[in-house]
Regions:
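Alpha-helical adaptor scaffolds
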Residues: 95, 103-105, 119, 127, ...
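Amphipathic alpha-helical scaffolding segments comprising HEAT/armadillo-like alpha-solenoid repeats
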Residues: 5-26, 45-60, 79-91, 110-123, ...
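Eukaryotic acidic, Ser/Thr-rich intrinsically disordered low-complexity regions
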Residues: 184-233
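Conserved hydrophobic register position within alpha-solenoid helical repeats
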Residues: 38, 70, 101, 133, ...
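Non-membrane alpha-helical segments in proteins
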Residues: 33-41, 56, 64-76, 100-103
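Short inter-helical turns and helix N-cap capping residues of alpha-solenoid HEAT/ARM repeat scaffolds
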Residues: 30-31, 62-63, 93-95, 125-126, ...
Length: 233
Protein backbone atom coordinates (compact mmCIF):
# COMPACT_ATOMS: atom_id res chain seq x y z
CA UNK A 1 0.00 0.00 0.00
CA UNK A 2 1.36 3.38 -0.99
CA UNK A 3 1.03 6.23 1.51
CA UNK A 4 0.81 9.60 -0.20
CA UNK A 5 1.55 13.06 1.15
CA UNK A 6 -2.18 13.73 1.08
CA UNK A 7 -2.78 10.75 3.37
CA UNK A 8 -0.13 12.00 5.79
CA UNK A 9 -1.70 15.47 5.84
CA UNK A 10 -5.08 13.94 6.63
CA UNK A 11 -3.55 11.94 9.49
CA UNK A 12 -1.88 15.08 10.85
CA UNK A 13 -5.14 17.03 10.69
CA UNK A 14 -6.99 14.20 12.42
CA UNK A 15 -4.38 14.11 15.21
CA UNK A 16 -4.63 17.88 15.64
CA UNK A 17 -8.41 17.70 15.83
CA UNK A 18 -8.21 14.92 18.41
CA UNK A 19 -5.77 16.97 20.50
CA UNK A 20 -8.09 19.97 20.29
CA UNK A 21 -11.04 17.91 21.49
CA UNK A 22 -9.01 16.59 24.43
CA UNK A 23 -7.92 20.08 25.43
CA UNK A 24 -11.44 21.48 25.22
CA UNK A 25 -12.74 18.61 27.33
CA UNK A 26 -9.95 19.27 29.79
CA UNK A 27 -11.12 22.86 30.25
CA UNK A 28 -14.45 21.49 31.48
CA UNK A 29 -13.09 18.69 33.67
CA UNK A 30 -14.38 18.54 37.24
CA UNK A 31 -10.79 18.54 38.56
CA UNK A 32 -9.17 21.96 38.78
CA UNK A 33 -5.71 20.49 38.20
CA UNK A 34 -6.85 19.09 34.85
CA UNK A 35 -8.42 22.40 33.86
CA UNK A 36 -5.21 24.17 34.79
CA UNK A 37 -3.12 21.86 32.61
CA UNK A 38 -5.56 22.28 29.73
CA UNK A 39 -5.34 26.07 29.93
CA UNK A 40 -1.55 25.83 30.05
CA UNK A 41 -1.58 23.60 26.97
CA UNK A 42 -3.74 26.08 25.06
CA UNK A 43 -1.40 28.94 25.89
CA UNK A 44 1.68 26.91 25.04
CA UNK A 45 0.34 26.00 21.60
CA UNK A 46 -2.10 28.80 20.66
CA UNK A 47 -4.89 27.86 18.28
CA UNK A 48 -7.50 30.37 17.04
CA UNK A 49 -10.16 27.69 17.47
CA UNK A 50 -9.74 27.95 21.24
CA UNK A 51 -10.36 31.69 21.68
CA UNK A 52 -14.14 31.65 22.05
CA UNK A 53 -14.04 28.67 24.39
CA UNK A 54 -11.38 30.31 26.56
CA UNK A 55 -13.48 33.45 26.89
CA UNK A 56 -16.57 31.41 27.70
CA UNK A 57 -14.68 29.43 30.32
CA UNK A 58 -13.41 32.59 32.01
CA UNK A 59 -17.02 33.52 32.74
CA UNK A 60 -17.74 30.39 34.75
CA UNK A 61 -14.39 29.03 36.02
CA UNK A 62 -14.63 28.90 39.84
CA UNK A 63 -10.91 28.71 40.68
CA UNK A 64 -8.84 31.90 40.66
CA UNK A 65 -5.58 30.25 39.62
CA UNK A 66 -7.28 28.53 36.67
CA UNK A 67 -8.89 31.81 35.59
CA UNK A 68 -5.47 33.42 35.70
CA UNK A 69 -4.09 30.70 33.45
CA UNK A 70 -7.03 31.17 31.07
CA UNK A 71 -6.17 34.87 30.88
CA UNK A 72 -2.54 34.01 30.17
CA UNK A 73 -3.64 31.62 27.41
CA UNK A 74 -5.73 34.37 25.83
CA UNK A 75 -2.79 36.77 25.86
CA UNK A 76 -0.87 34.21 23.79
CA UNK A 77 -3.37 34.43 20.93
CA UNK A 78 -3.55 37.13 18.24
CA UNK A 79 -5.07 40.36 19.53
CA UNK A 80 -7.14 40.57 16.35
CA UNK A 81 -9.06 37.53 17.58
CA UNK A 82 -9.14 38.07 21.34
CA UNK A 83 -9.99 41.77 21.43
CA UNK A 84 -13.45 41.58 19.79
CA UNK A 85 -14.46 38.62 21.96
CA UNK A 86 -13.34 40.31 25.18
CA UNK A 87 -14.98 43.63 24.30
CA UNK A 88 -18.25 41.78 23.80
CA UNK A 89 -17.77 40.02 27.12
CA UNK A 90 -17.49 43.21 29.18
CA UNK A 91 -21.15 43.80 28.31
CA UNK A 92 -22.19 40.39 29.66
CA UNK A 93 -24.91 40.12 32.30
CA UNK A 94 -22.66 37.73 34.23
CA UNK A 95 -20.45 39.69 36.61
CA UNK A 96 -17.55 37.21 36.51
CA UNK A 97 -17.54 37.42 32.73
CA UNK A 98 -17.23 41.21 32.88
CA UNK A 99 -14.57 41.13 35.57
CA UNK A 100 -12.37 38.53 33.91
CA UNK A 101 -12.69 40.11 30.47
CA UNK A 102 -11.59 43.45 31.92
CA UNK A 103 -8.70 41.76 33.71
CA UNK A 104 -7.60 40.11 30.46
CA UNK A 105 -7.87 43.37 28.52
CA UNK A 106 -5.58 44.99 31.09
CA UNK A 107 -3.04 42.22 30.54
CA UNK A 108 -3.22 42.52 26.75
CA UNK A 109 -2.85 46.30 27.03
CA UNK A 110 -4.17 47.21 23.58
CA UNK A 111 -5.62 50.71 23.75
CA UNK A 112 -8.13 49.95 21.03
CA UNK A 113 -10.18 48.45 23.86
CA UNK A 114 -10.47 51.83 25.61
CA UNK A 115 -13.97 52.69 24.28
CA UNK A 116 -15.26 49.57 26.03
CA UNK A 117 -14.24 50.96 29.44
CA UNK A 118 -17.44 52.84 30.15
CA UNK A 119 -18.51 54.90 33.14
CA UNK A 120 -21.03 52.15 33.85
CA UNK A 121 -18.22 49.61 34.26
CA UNK A 122 -16.11 52.00 36.34
CA UNK A 123 -19.03 52.31 38.76
CA UNK A 124 -20.33 48.75 38.42
CA UNK A 125 -22.40 47.60 41.38
CA UNK A 126 -20.28 44.46 41.54
CA UNK A 127 -17.10 45.41 43.39
CA UNK A 128 -14.90 42.88 41.58
CA UNK A 129 -16.04 44.23 38.22
CA UNK A 130 -15.43 47.83 39.27
CA UNK A 131 -11.95 47.03 40.57
CA UNK A 132 -11.07 45.23 37.35
CA UNK A 133 -12.39 48.20 35.38
CA UNK A 134 -10.25 50.63 37.38
CA UNK A 135 -7.11 48.62 36.70
CA UNK A 136 -7.93 48.21 33.02
CA UNK A 137 -8.73 51.90 32.62
CA UNK A 138 -5.34 52.98 33.95
CA UNK A 139 -3.59 50.69 31.47
CA UNK A 140 -5.74 51.56 28.46
CA UNK A 141 -6.48 55.28 28.87
CA UNK A 142 -5.22 57.25 25.85
CA UNK A 143 -2.68 60.02 26.32
CA UNK A 144 -4.42 63.25 27.24
CA UNK A 145 -7.53 61.62 28.72
CA UNK A 146 -6.11 60.85 32.15
CA UNK A 147 -7.71 63.88 33.83
CA UNK A 148 -11.15 62.89 32.60
CA UNK A 149 -10.61 59.37 33.87
CA UNK A 150 -9.50 60.74 37.24
CA UNK A 151 -12.75 62.68 37.55
CA UNK A 152 -14.78 59.53 36.92
CA UNK A 153 -12.69 57.48 39.35
CA UNK A 154 -13.09 60.18 41.97
CA UNK A 155 -16.83 59.48 42.03
CA UNK A 156 -15.98 56.10 43.56
CA UNK A 157 -13.97 57.47 46.49
CA UNK A 158 -15.18 56.20 49.84
CA UNK A 159 -16.65 53.06 48.32
CA UNK A 160 -16.35 49.68 50.00
CA UNK A 161 -13.90 48.22 52.48
CA UNK A 162 -10.13 48.54 52.74
CA UNK A 163 -9.21 46.35 49.75
CA UNK A 164 -11.61 48.17 47.46
CA UNK A 165 -10.40 51.58 48.57
CA UNK A 166 -6.79 50.49 48.20
CA UNK A 167 -7.46 49.33 44.63
CA UNK A 168 -8.96 52.69 43.74
CA UNK A 169 -6.13 54.64 45.36
CA UNK A 170 -3.58 52.56 43.46
CA UNK A 171 -5.37 53.27 40.19
CA UNK A 172 -5.46 57.00 40.91
CA UNK A 173 -1.83 57.11 42.00
CA UNK A 174 -0.84 55.29 38.81
CA UNK A 175 -2.32 58.18 36.81
CA UNK A 176 0.07 60.59 38.49
CA UNK A 177 -0.23 64.27 39.34
CA UNK A 178 -3.08 64.74 36.87
CA UNK A 179 -5.46 63.44 39.56
CA UNK A 180 -4.66 66.27 42.02
CA UNK A 181 -7.55 68.59 41.04
CA UNK A 182 -10.08 65.79 41.45
CA UNK A 183 -8.55 64.79 44.79
CA UNK A 184 -8.56 68.38 46.08
CA UNK A 185 -12.24 68.69 45.23
CA UNK A 186 -13.08 65.35 46.84
CA UNK A 187 -11.13 66.27 49.98
CA UNK A 188 -13.74 68.94 50.72
CA UNK A 189 -16.70 66.60 50.21
CA UNK A 190 -19.32 66.50 52.99
CA UNK A 191 -19.14 62.69 53.08
CA UNK A 192 -16.39 61.84 55.61
CA UNK A 193 -15.56 58.55 53.88
CA UNK A 194 -15.02 60.30 50.55
CA UNK A 195 -12.98 63.01 52.20
CA UNK A 196 -10.75 60.57 54.10
CA UNK A 197 -10.19 58.44 51.02
CA UNK A 198 -9.25 61.49 48.94
CA UNK A 199 -6.81 62.73 51.59
CA UNK A 200 -5.25 59.26 51.86
CA UNK A 201 -4.83 59.10 48.09
CA UNK A 202 -3.16 62.52 48.09
CA UNK A 203 -0.77 61.24 50.77
CA UNK A 204 0.09 58.23 48.61
CA UNK A 205 0.66 60.51 45.62
CA UNK A 206 3.26 62.42 47.62
CA UNK A 207 4.76 59.32 49.20
CA UNK A 208 3.88 55.99 47.53
CA UNK A 209 5.91 54.17 50.20
CA UNK A 210 3.73 55.47 53.03
CA UNK A 211 1.28 52.57 52.88
CA UNK A 212 -2.49 52.79 52.72
CA UNK A 213 -3.10 52.11 56.42
CA UNK A 214 -0.81 54.95 57.41
CA UNK A 215 -2.31 57.27 54.80
CA UNK A 216 -5.92 56.62 55.78
CA UNK A 217 -5.02 56.94 59.46
CA UNK A 218 -3.35 60.28 58.83
CA UNK A 219 -6.37 61.44 56.82
CA UNK A 220 -8.70 60.63 59.69
CA UNK A 221 -6.49 62.48 62.15
CA UNK A 222 -6.53 65.54 59.91
CA UNK A 223 -10.31 65.38 59.71
CA UNK A 224 -10.62 64.99 63.48
CA UNK A 225 -8.56 68.15 63.92
CA UNK A 226 -10.91 69.94 61.56
CA UNK A 227 -8.51 70.43 58.64
CA UNK A 228 -8.71 69.41 55.02
CA UNK A 229 -5.04 68.59 54.66
CA UNK A 230 -4.68 71.24 51.97
CA UNK A 231 -2.82 73.88 53.94
CA UNK A 232 0.67 74.62 52.75
CA UNK A 233 0.30 72.64 49.55
Amino acid sequence: MTITGHDMDMDTDADADADAVRVLRGLEDSRSSVRLRAALAVGTAPDPRFVDRLVERCAIEPEFFVRDMLTWALTRHPVSMTLPALVREVRSERSQARSQALHTLSKIGDRRAWPAITRKLLSDVDTDVARSAWRAAVVLVPDGEEAGLAEVLATQLGRGERETQLSLSRALVALGDVVEPAMRAAATAPDPYVCAHALATQRLLRDPEAGFEFAIGEARRVMTLGGSGQEGR
